[in-house]
Design a protein with these regions (language model features):
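Nucleotide-sugar donor-binding catalytic core of glycosyltransferases
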Residues: 1-52, 58-66, 73-74, 82-89, ...
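Active-site donor-binding loop signature of nucleotide-sugar glycosyltransferases
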Residues: 34, 107, 156, 286-287
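Short, conserved structural micro-motifs that define repeat-unit consensus positions
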Residues: 81-84, 95-102
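A short, histidine- and acid-enriched strand-loop-helix "catalytic/donor-clamping" loop
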Residues: 103-117
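Conserved acidic donor-binding segment of nucleotide-sugar-dependent glycosyltransferases
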Residues: 282-288, 297-303
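A charged, aromatic-enriched C-terminal amphipathic alpha-helix characteristic of glycosyltransferases
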Residues: 300-335
Length: 340
């Protein structure tokens, strides 16, 4: 099987995991970095930003020309687009006329745009062109089915080396609250409210200093790579907060925290209750007041009990296949259904 994946090749891109594990499974993959091409142009200088915003830039035309040329050369069995903000519907229609099945995976939502990078008209206008829509979000799956688009659930996952996990296990625990992520309006408001209720919290991310100023909030730069996993494991309480497009589901942190054996405090969504056992593998909250109570409860756990919860959620992650290698195996089954 030959799969053409269009998306990003930046270090944080989820498509990297599928490229890695599809190749491991024997699939020939071409990774076309459409989003990277756009951002490399847009972020190069102020001039490029002005030209793009004025509508005079040819960057998207160039990307779509390259998209078609690479497809012609690679001759894939399937085209898998991640999100698709840079790909014109006309380019997808061109591929469809060549009888190449089209698959989409959107790590945000094609229906709810919560920021500049979460969607655009290319995403909206391409929905009906896809033969298969993979999503982590059950509400999006339902909406796709009303539009007569075949849709399947493909949750987020984690990708953590065994040697790094073993190292993380040895890290001395800090009995404090941590939040890993960049600020948005809802996150800032919630964390400010926690601070007002005398909850001390360490936040890691970009630009937090612009939005919060409290003696109860300590701000650190974002962490990546191996350091990300070390920080995720290190704290007694890892707070997870949802965004407007995933308020009822789960996010990437849901399974990353589980995979490293972190003690996660997350909103009581349907997904979190489906994938984890409350009070045994995760702690859930419904509002600010219950979050504060849960924080106190978790911080007061005996170390032996805390370690038991860490062991439970790590074990659940392994037993139920929450890692990206298993997610890729599931995705591959769907891809095979398209061409057989």
């Amino acid at each position: 099987m030959r799969v053409f994946i269009a998306g990003s090749d930046k270090v944080y891109a989820i498509e990297n995991f599928y490229v890695k594990y599809l190749r491991k499974a024997g699939v020939e993959v071409y990774h076309f970095p459409a989003q990277t091409m756009f951002y490399d142009y847009y972020q190069k200088n102020v001039y490029n930003k002005i030209v793009y915003k004025s509508g005079l830039s040819s960057v998207l035309n160039d990307i779509n020309r390259a998209f078609r040329n690479k497809i012609e050369a690679f001759r894939p069995d399937i085209i898998w687009v991640f999100k698709g903000m840079e790909i014109f519907p006309e380019s997808l229609q061109w591929a469809k006329l060549k009888s190449i099945p089209l698959v989409n995976y959107n790590g945000d939502s094609p229906f709810v745009f919560s920021g500049k990078g979460s969607g655009n008209e290319n995403v909206t206008n391409s929905i009906g062109l896809y033969d298969l829509f993979l999503t982590y979000n059950r509400e999006d799956k339902k909406q796709m089915e009303t539009k007569k688009v075949w849709s399947e659930i493909l949750p987020f996952g984690y990708d953590l080396r065994d040697d790094l996990f073993n190292e993380c296990q040895q890290i001395e625990e800090m009995n404090q609250v941590c939040f890993l992520g960049n600020p948005d309006e809802e996150r800032v408001s919630f964390i400010k409210d926690l601070a007002k209720m005398n909850v001390k919290i360490d936040v890691y991310g970009n630009n937090w200093k612009r939005y919060v100023n409290s003696s109860n909030i300590s701000i650190y730069q974002p962490v990546y790579g191996d350091d990300f996993w070390r920080i995720l494991r290190k704290y007694r309480v890892q707070l997870n907060l949802m965004r407007p497009h995933n308020l009822t589901t789960h996010n990437m942190r849901s399974f990353e925290a589980a995979g490293v054996g972190a003690i996660q405090l997350a909103p009581a969504t349907e997904d979190h209750q489906l994938y984890f056992k409350d009070n045994e593998e995760i702690f859930l909250f419904k509002d600010l007041q219950s979050c504060v109570k849960q924080i106190a409860k978790i911080k007061n756990l005996p170390l032996e009990k805390a370690n038991c919860i860490r062991k439970n959620v790590r074990g659940r992650s392994l037993a139920d296949g929450y890692n990206y290698e298993k997610r890729s195996e599931k995705a591959l089954l769907f891809l095979k259904m398209l061409i057989h």
